[in-house]
Amino acid sequence: MSDLKAQDSLRDFDVRTTFVFNDYPLRGSLVNLSQAWRDVLRPHPSWPRAAADTLGRFLAATVLMAGSLKFKGELKTQISGSGYLNMLSAVATSDGTCRGTLSVDDSMPIGPEGARDLGALVGRDTPIVIALLTDKAAPYLGVAPIEGGDAADALANYLARSEQVDSALSLAADDSRIAGLLLQKMPDAKSDEGDGAEIEAIKAMARSAMPEELLQTPAPALLRRLFGEYDLTALRQDPIVFRCSCGREKAAAGVVAMGLEGARELLDERGGIEVRCDNCLETYLFDEKDVDNLFRRPAR
């Protein structure tokens, strides 16, 4: 494996490793997040395991997909459904940060199939929405139905349908790590006619990665184990950390969105307005003076 022999220069965890196959038109990304995932989970000890693991797999996939795009901004994967897991949001930014949140409907028992079947967990008619948000252009939205039994199948189908990118994806999550491996055929790349079978074999190897392998094996060792017979070049490693995007300015915008009448009703009922971040649970307080300042019209 070409440049990957210099393993001492590659970090093992909390990074996204991007690599290419030198003899085939394939690029890949591998991510294994430990500290970042624990930071996502820390404010939410009551999240049910099946729901948290599903968020973890989608967050790993979102970090992988963000690494293959050329943009300045953030990529968001969102599900809003009618099942037990009725909301999921996973975000990765071009700056190497990630965050995620979820909500569940406790009135809908998960059932034995829910932990294994994504459709059973979120609702059969629920679509996946992928949003690319930048400060340079209007948001791009991609929508695809949930097909396949798990997050990896559903997102690979999304990439094939909405992005027309031939992909192989493996994902894993537990209460201390999340991990993922994404292989994609390079668009418009030329290859020999005989390469097709070999490319399919490589993709099958990627899909065969067991959850324990993805979660516990350092990046260089995992690439060696899966693709040791191929010539690979590691292009870069990007550190990934948890970082919430909340702040008082964003919270204030939420108060303004209520409208003056709605804000004053809350003030009358509760004596103040609390805006809580879904990701980190930071709470921002606004009193009557704050509300007056937010809705004060600029002098003419």
Language model segments and positions:
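Cys/His-clustered metal-coordination modules, chiefly Zn-binding fingers
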Residues: 206-300
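Interaction interfaces in information-processing and related assembly proteins
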Residues: 2-236
